[in-house]
């Protein structure tokens, strides 16, 4: 349901998904959120870019029309929407990247990195946020952030999904 609410939020804020440029940054390799978003966004006509450390961003995504980047600037500079994924601390033990500090330095969205971002780009995150890792507080709480709207929309979208899977309901109060 995360991809449904992410796409709902994008559509609510940007209008049509068709032609929208969406960057997904982080651990693409292990993320169901990334894969679901990629599938849904491509089906709806968006242009998708994925970015992150090379071991966490499989080149195989290029085969389905996704642009693959291994530096933050290239991933986000043309994006209408930037969706940052949570880095799971257990990935540190698997040596996908040297340290949390190293990840944050090269792939964390902070005030300095925001210089490369379009002024009207939306900043999204499925949560929970590791502040200071995927993005800093100034960005998470800044004017481009729609993270709280994602949370709000998540409740409505998930209620709608439950309503639909529950089958025929005779009375809605």
Predicted regions span which residues?
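A glycine-rich, Thr/Ser-enriched phosphate-binding loop motif common to dinucleotide/cofactor-binding enzymes
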Residues: 1-9
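Catalytic cores of large soluble enzymes that bind and process phosphate-bearing ligands
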Residues: 2, 102, 106, 153
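Catalytic-loop motifs flanking and including active-site residues across diverse enzymes
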Residues: 2, 33, 157-158
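Glycine-rich phosphate/diphosphate-binding loop of Rossmann-like nucleotide-binding domains
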Residues: 11-85
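Rossmann-like adenosine-cofactor binding region
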Residues: 61-138
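Adenosine-phosphate binding glycine-rich loop
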Residues: 120-173
């Amino acid at each position: 349901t995360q991809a449904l609410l992410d796409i709902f939020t994008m559509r609510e804020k940007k209008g049509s998904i068709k032609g929208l440029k969406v960057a997904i940054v982080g651990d693409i390799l292990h993320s169901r959120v990334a894969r679901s978003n990629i599938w849904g966004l491509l089906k709806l006509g968006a242009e998708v870019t994925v970015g992150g450390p090379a071991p966490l961003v499989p080149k195989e995504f290029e085969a389905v029309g996704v642009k693959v980047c291994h530096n933050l600037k290239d991933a986000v500079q043309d994006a209408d929407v930037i969706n940052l994924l949570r880095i799971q601390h257990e990935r540190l033990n698997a040596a996908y990247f040297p340290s949390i500090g190293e990840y944050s330095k090269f792939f964390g969205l902070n005030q300095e990195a925001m210089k490369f971002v379009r002024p009207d780009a939306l900043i999204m995150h499925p949560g929970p946020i590791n502040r200071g890792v995927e993005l800093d507080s100034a960005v998470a709480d800044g004017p481009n952030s729609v993270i709280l709207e994602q949370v709000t929309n998540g409740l409505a979208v998930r209620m709608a999904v439950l309503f639909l899977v529950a089958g025929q309901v005779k009375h809605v109060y």
